[in-house]
Design a protein with these regions (language model features):
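Glycine-rich phosphate/diphosphate-binding loop of Rossmann-like nucleotide-binding domains
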Residues: 1-26
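Short, glycine-/small-residue-rich phosphate/pyrophosphate-handling segment
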Residues: 29-32, 81, 90-128
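Structural motif
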Residues: 33-46
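Short Gly/Thr/Asp-enriched flexible loops that form oxyanion-binding sites at enzyme active sites
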Residues: 47, 66-76
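Short acidic/histidine-rich motifs immediately flanking catalytic phosphotransfer sites
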Residues: 48-55
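Short glycine-rich anion-binding loops that position phosphate/pyrophosphate groups of nucleotides
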Residues: 60-63, 86-88
Length: 128
C-alpha cells in the first residue's frame, strides 16, 4: 500500500474509472496500462503509438532516471503530459528532478488523482 499522505486513497482502478468517465464526456477513448518495469512501459508505448493521439504518464521513480522511457516518449512524437499524485517539487531533493518534464507539454504535480483529469482535459483541448 502506498503512503496515503503522499498519494491519496483512490486506487488505480478508481482513477482509471474516473478517466474513462471523463473521456466518455469528450467522446474519446483511453487505454490504460501500469507496470513497474521500464521495458514493459516502453513496449506498450511503442505498440500503441500508431493508434494514439497523446500520452498521460505517471513515470513514478522512473521520473528521475528513466532515460529509455524518455526516449520512447520522444520517439512516439505525441503530446505527453507527466502526472504525479504528490508534489514532487516539495519532497526530497532527489525526487525533484524529472528527465521527462523537459519533453512533456506539461507536468502536473501535487493535484492528487485529479491531476489525471487535468491532463486529459489539457490533451483534449490541445488536440481539438
Amino acid at each position: 500500500m502506498r503512503d496515503q499522505s503522499h498519494y491519496g486513497s483512490k486506487t488505480l482502478d478508481e482513477i482509471c474509472a474516473a478517466l474513462v468517465e471523463r473521456a466518455t464526456e469528450f467522446g474519446v477513448e483511453i487505454f490504460d496500462f501500469q507496470s513497474n518495469h521500464e521495458g514493459a512501459l516502453i513496449d506498450f508505448i511503442q505498440a500503441q503509438t500508431a493508434g494514439a493521439d497523446g500520452i498521460i504518464i505517471n513515470p513514478g521513480a522512473l521520473t528521475h532516471y528513466g532515460l529509455s522511457l524518455m526516449d520512447a516518449l520522444i520517439d512516439a512524437k505525441l503530446p505527453v503530459v507527466e502526472v504525479h499524485l504528490s508534489d514532487i517539487h516539495s519532497r526530497e531533493e532527489f525526487r525533484q528532478k524529472s528527465v521527462i518534464e523537459p519533453m512533456a507539454r506539461k507536468q502536473i504535480s501535487g493535484h492528487g488523482w485529479q491531476g489525471y483529469i487535468e491532463a486529459l482535459d489539457l490533451l483534449v483541448e490541445e488536440l481539438k
